[in-house]
Each structure stands twice: as C-alpha cells, then as structure tokens.
UniProtKB/Swiss-Prot annotation:
UniProt-listed InterPro entries: Ig-like_fold (IPR013783), Ig_E-set (IPR014756), PIP (IPR007990)
Glycosylation sites recorded in the entry for this protein: 105
UniProt-recorded Gene Ontology molecular function terms: aspartic-type endopeptidase activity
Signal peptide range in chain numbering: 1-28
Annotated organism of origin: Macaca fuscata fuscata
Disulfide bond sites: 65-91, 89-123
GO process annotations (BP): proteolysis; regulation of immune system process
Name this protein carries in UniProt: Prolactin-inducible protein homolog
Pfam families named in the record: SVA
Claim: Glycoprotein is one of the keywords in the record: yes
Modified residues (Pyrrolidone carboxylic acid): 29
UniProt record similarity statement: Belongs to the PIP family.
Subunit structure: Monomer. Interacts with AZGP1.
Gene3D superfamilies hit by this protein: Immunoglobulins (2.60.40.10)
Length: 146
C-alpha cells in the first residue's frame, strides 16, 4: 500500500523512468545486423597482359539464408573469366569466397556486385529470404595498368 501511495506522489518523469527500467530498453535499434559484408581485393597496379586475380569474400549477419548472385562489372570490356557469374546460398555461418583470374591492357574500374535474388534450388529446402530495403550491394576498385 505504501508503494502505491509513493507512485501516486512521484513525478511523471520518475514514473516513466521506472517503466522504462522495468520493461527494458528496445534492443532492435542497437542490434542492427548487416545484410551483406564484402571484402573485395584486387591489386592496385598490374603490367600489360599480366594475369590479375580478384578475390571477393561475401558474408552476412542475418540468421536467415539468402540466394546471392555475384559477378564483376567494369567500365571497359574485359574478356575471359572476368565475366563469370556465381549463384550460391549465403548463410551467416559460412561466408562465400569467389575468385576471378583475368587479363587487361587498360586501367579499369571494377565493381564487385552482389545481387540478392529469388531462385529455387539453391538454398537447402528453398529456405531463403530477400531483403526489402535493398537487394544490390557493390564495391568499386581501380586497377591501374602500367
């Protein structure tokens, strides 16, 4: 009874503070998971007709799996394995690593692109999600040819 009398005498700010402490803070905004994390590595310089290897590691912090289509694109045409496109299941416990070996005679800007798509037969039991906010992620690097 005394506690009830105390609450009626307390200020509205105190009541709000007690309510927030009792219910706990909303952790949804503090614990935002990243959809795609990219680590794209290519050499910064290369010689003419030298074979260059591009490596892209893709991972997610989401608990659900996604179907990821991964490819490279550039501002100038590049022949060979540069044009390979990969489609794999991406889950939080297993990052995917992709490799491209190619030759170029010109300085080129390369974008590593990850599209989250809807495709059956890629993830186990076709259990995959598609983000609502954004489904294309990319990183751009420049390869200077000397």
């Amino acid at each position: 009874m005394r506690l009830l009398q105390f609450l009626f005498r307390a200020s509205p700010a105190t009541l709000l503070l007690v309510l927030c402490l009792h219910l706990g803070a909303n952790k949804a905004q503090e614990n935002t998971r990243r959809i795609i994390i990219q680590n794209f590595e290519i050499p910064t310089t290369a010689n003419r007709d030298e074979e260059v290897t591009a490596v892209l590691q893709v991972k997610t912090e989401l608990k659900e799996c996604m179907v990821a289509k991964v490819y490279l694109t550039s501002d100038v045409p590049v022949e060979g394995a540069f044009n390979y496109k990969y489609t794999r299941c991406l889950c939080d416990d297993y990052p995917n690593t992709y490799y491209w070996d190619f030759h170029t005679n010109r300085t080129v800007q390369i974008a590593a692109v990850v599209d989250i798509i809807r495709e059956l037969g890629i993830c186990p039991n076709d259990a995959a999600v598609t983000p609502i906010s954004k489904n294309r992620f990319y990183t751009i690097k420049t390869l200077v040819v000397a």
